[in-house]
Amino acid sequence: MEETLMKKSVLALAALGILAAPAAVIAQVYPAKTVRVVIPWPAGGSNDVVGRIVMQKLSESLGQQFVVDNRGGAAGSIGADVVAKAPPDGYTIMVHSTTHVGNAHLYGKKLTYDTLRDFAGVGMLSAQPGVLTVHPSLPVKTPKEFIALAKSRPGQINYSSSGNGSAPHLQMALLISMTGINITHVPYKGGAPQVTALLAGETQASFATVGTVINHIRSGKLRPLGLGSTKPSKALPNVPTLTEAGVPGYDMSPWIGVFVPAGTPKPIIDKLNAEINKALVLPDVVKSLENQALDAAPSTVDQFNTALKVDYEKYGKLIKLTGAKIE
């Protein structure tokens, strides 16, 4: 009875726009109504799949529906704009990827929001390790051999990406900047044509998320050389990280995480983070993510926000280095 009255009071305050109620009180009964989960990508992609898996668990554990609202377009910036303008009350949250920080540098002043100032990070959901992959016709089996071959054939090896400024483009740009190799970028419009070109031998190398190439690797149609993350991939346990395989310090692993509008009360952020982390260790969630060749990546709020700032700077430097931009 007492909890019901408290929930009604919180909803009344929210309806009146009164945000001065004690944050701890609001968080105690949060969520008191349906939560909108904006996923700024079409249904069926990694962000959507991961978001739905975890948000279903939050619906079950918190007793309110976390309803997905797919708002695709402009590499996630359309949906992000919706969240940036939403009330900071915990009832609009966003599932987005590393693309969020890249967009800040690709779109620049074209964005209607500030990537760091207008959002608060809640926590990471999963890591999407990228893997340096080559067509089997390229006579290399290790990152060191790839680098040596590229140096012996400056400008002759080409690599595909899913577009200018995309994660695969920037992952290779980092490798180029760290090793001094000279290889040619061939951008495609999306991950599917990027991988198709590599399979056909139109391009000879590429970075791709493990999930997009795992079946081709298992069938022998593509050859993995090294992971862009600092941790091994459960889907490719025999593939070393680039740091282990001769490129010390290489670390660029895309992720998927949860955000809220800036100004959302910290107790609500902390509560969401705790529930997300509980969900990420559930055996069925871990298994569902592994089926997508993704690794669960629980984090604290501070760890996630630190990663955001590090990747914001890293992506900014790489985008400036490549000259990539959205016209």
Where are these regions (language model features)?
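Bacterial N-terminal signal peptides
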Residues: 12-21
